[in-house]
């Protein structure tokens, strides 16, 4: 009896549901995020802007809230609420990575978001706040300071949108 050959390509470990490649991406994000935060804390005094270009400063600031310092002055409970939210998000993302491991752009996006979320969770647990230091501005108008974890979350979110647009266009 002849064995029939499958016409599909062999599945990669990511396609088989392995979390390892995606957790590796998240770990790289966490490492770069934490190393930059450690360096900034060692080099800069709190709140002192260091001009890099006419539109970009490095400045050590603490964010006790969420994005754009949302709920930063809420009295302390937000530390634990945003930590719990980050942990729940990480668990959901791990489930999605395991379930959709073969979808490279989707999983890359999720891995970036995972790394960013956990980078900020580490800050909340270790310091009670998130360390921010990237300050873009136009004259006197400053975008809220952020960090590499926030950047990874943003890039991941953009990739999710692009992946969905590509998927929808491909199904037409």
From Swiss-Prot:
UniProt pathway annotation: Protein modification; lipoprotein biosynthesis (signal peptide cleavage)
- InterPro entries in alphabetical order: Peptidase_A8 (IPR001872)
Transmembrane segments in this chain: where? 12-32, 43-63, 77-97, 102-122, 142-162
The compartments listed are: Cell inner membrane
What's its top-level EC category? hydrolase
Catalyzed chemical reaction(s): Release of signal peptides from bacterial membrane prolipoproteins. Hydrolyzes -Xaa-Yaa-Zaa-|-(S,diacylglyceryl)Cys-, in which Xaa is hydrophobic (preferably Leu), and Yaa (Ala or Ser) and Zaa (Gly or Ala) have small, neutral side chains
Give the domain of life. Answer: Bacteria
Q: What is its EC number?
A: 3.4.23.36
What Pfam family is a match, any one? Peptidase_A8
State the membrane topology: Multi-pass membrane protein
Predominant place of localization: membrane
One GO molecular-function entry = aspartic-type endopeptidase activity
Active site at 132, 150
What biological processes does GO assign it? proteolysis
| A GO CC annotation given for this chain | plasma membrane
Q: HAMAP family this protein is in? A: LspA
According to its UniProt entry, the function of this protein is described as:
This protein specifically catalyzes the removal of signal peptides from prolipoproteins.
Q: What family does the entry list?
A: Belongs to the peptidase A8 family.
The protein here is known as Lipoprotein signal peptidase
């Amino acid at each position: 009896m002849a064995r029939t050959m499958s016409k599909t390509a062999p599945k990669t470990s990511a396609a088989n549901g392995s979390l390892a490649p995606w957790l590796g991406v998240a770990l790289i994000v966490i490492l770069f995020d934490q190393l930059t935060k450690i360096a900034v804390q060692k080099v800069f005094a709190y709140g002192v802007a260091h001009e890099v270009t006419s539109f970009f400063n490095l400045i050590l600031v603490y964010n006790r809230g969420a994005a754009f310092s949302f709920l930063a002055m809420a009295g302390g409970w937000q530390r634990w609420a945003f930590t719990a939210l980050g942990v729940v998000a990480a668990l959901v993302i791990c489930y999605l990575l395991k379930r959709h491991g073969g979808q490279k752009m989707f999983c890359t996006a999720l891995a970036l978001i995972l790394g960013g979320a956990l980078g900020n969770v580490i800050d909340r647990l270790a310091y009670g706040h998130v360390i921010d230091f990237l300050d873009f501005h136009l004259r006197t108008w400053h975008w809220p300071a952020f960090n590499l974890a926030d950047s990874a979350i943003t890039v991941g979110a953009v990739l999710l949108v692009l992946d969905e647009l590509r998927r929808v266009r491909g199904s037409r």
